[in-house]
Regions:
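N-terminal beta1-alpha1-beta2 module of alpha/beta enzyme domains
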Residues: 1-68, 73, 165
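Active-site beta-loop-alpha junctions enriched in small/polar residues
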Residues: 8-10, 46, 79-81, 109-113, ...
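Short coil/turn segments at secondary-structure junctions
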Residues: 13-17, 80, 118, 122
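Hydrophobic alpha-helix-in-membranes signature
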Residues: 43, 57, 79-81, 85, ...
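Hydrophobic residues in well-ordered beta-strands that form the structural core
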Residues: 43, 74-76, 108, 169
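Glycine-rich "substrate-gating" loop/helix at the edge of Rossmann-like oxidoreductase active sites
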Residues: 49-53, 79-85, 123-124
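Gly/Ser/Thr-rich helix-start
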Residues: 51, 64, 76, 108-112, ...
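Internal, glycine-rich beta/alpha segment that forms the wall or movable "lid"
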Residues: 85-182
C-alpha cells in the first residue's frame, strides 16, 4: 500500500508562523516522509487567501523538496489552469522532472476561488473555457515538446520527458468528470 501526503501550508490557529517557518516545516516533513517510504507529497497552489495557504509558488517549493529528498515523488495538486500560461507550466514541469530525477507528478484543475481568479484578472464565468483550452495546449506541449506561433516553431528546453505525459484532473462537475475520463 502506498500512502501519500497533501500539504496545504496553512498557518494553524494559535500557532502564528511566517512563511519561512512553514517552508522549513515542509522540508522536514518531506525528509521524514522520504525516510519512512511515503509515496507522493502533493502541494496545492493558492493565492491571496491569508493564513489558509502559503502555497503560492509550488514549483519553487517542489524544487527545494527535490533537493531535500531522494525517493519521494513530488506533486502539483493542482495547478489552476485558468490563471496560467500552459507554455510556462510545461517548461516548469520539464525542469522539475529533470531536477528531481523523474519524481514529479502533476494535476490540473479549473477551480480556484473567485478571489484568486479575479486577482489574476480572469473572469470566473470564463474559467471553464480557459481551462479546456489551456489543458489541450498543455497536453500537446508535454507530448511534442514544441509549439507553433505566427509561423515559427519553438522548442521547449528542457524537453518534457515521456514520464510527464500522464497527469491528474481535479473534477467536481459532471462535465469535468467526462474530461478526466478521457
Amino acid at each position: 500500500m502506498e500512502i501519500d501526503l497533501f500539504c496545504e501550508l496553512a498557518s494553524p490557529p494559535g500557532r502564528p508562523q511566517g512563511a519561512d517557518g512553514l517552508f522549513q516545516d515542509l522540508i522536514d516533513v518531506a525528509r521524514a516522509a522520504d525516510r519512512l517510504g511515503f509515496g507522493t507529497l502533493w502541494l496545492p497552489e493558492h493565492h491571496f487567501l491569508g493564513d489558509y495557504s502559503a502555497a503560492s509558488a509550488p514549483d519553487i517549493l517542489l524544487g527545494a523538496l527535490a533537493q531535500a529528498t531522494e525517493r519521494l515523488k513530488l506533486g502539483f495538486g493542482v495547478l489552476p489552469l485558468p490563471i496560467h500560461d500552459p507554455i510556462r507550466i510545461a517548461e516548469r514541469l520539464a525542469t522539475l522532472d529533470a531536477l528531481s530525477g523523474g519524481r514529479i507528478m502533476w494535476g490540473v484543475g479549473r477551480g480556484v476561488t473567485t478571489t484568486e481568479l479575479e486577482g489574476f484578472g480572469a473572469e470566473p464565468s470564463s474559467s471553464r473555457e480557459i481551462f479546456l483550452e489551456n489543458f489541450a495546449d498543455l497536453q500537446l506541449l508535454l507530448e511534442s515538446g514544441s509549439f507553433e506561433r505566427a509561423g515559427a516553431v519553438y522548442s521547449l528546453n528542457p524537453r518534457p520527458s515521456a514520464r510527464l505525459k500522464d497527469g491528474w484532473v481535479a473534477a467536481v462537475s459532471p462535465e469535468t468528470f467526462d474530461l478526466a475520463a478521457e
